[in-house]
């Protein structure tokens, strides 16, 4: 389950500002340039070694442009730095760009529209459960672990083999 959440594709909605006012044509050209496989060096403050690596931007969509403000939807490979993506787009446009806001709207098969909740909402539901002993809201937020595992392949074994499997027996 953790692998799905960590390594699955992510979707973000981001608001950023570029320092020059791009034409619609130039913006379309840049969006095309940053879609697909890109090279990205993690930002100065990151938890990983700062060496250039490839990341895949599956979809980069301009939702709205209001002068220098760009609202985008980005579907990308795990490990992509969106703040750095905005910086790089700004560098190509000249003289730079910054991300202002970022919201993750999807992790692999888990979509925001399917009932994902914020940590704040979860904390509120937990507080209600603690104070009033009412778990209705909390139980509505908790999903079965099988949901996270649904994309993984499964293996069916005989009941008689369960004990041996639990002690390291080979499948084949």
Model-derived features with residue positions:
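Glycine/acidic-rich beta-strand-loop module
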Residues: 1-4
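Accessory RNA 3′-end/elbow-binding domains used by RNA modification enzymes
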Residues: 8, 13-15, 30-33, 45-52, ...
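Charged, alpha-helix-enriched surfaces in structured cytosolic catalytic cores
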Residues: 9, 22, 80, 84, ...
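Short beta-strand-to-loop capping motifs
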Residues: 16-20, 74-76
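Short, conserved charged micro-motifs
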Residues: 21-29
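Intrinsically disordered, low-complexity polar/charged tails and linkers
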Residues: 34-37, 85
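Short Pro/Gly-enriched beta-strand edge/turn motifs at strand-loop
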Residues: 38-46
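Aspartyl protease active-site motif detector
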Residues: 73-93
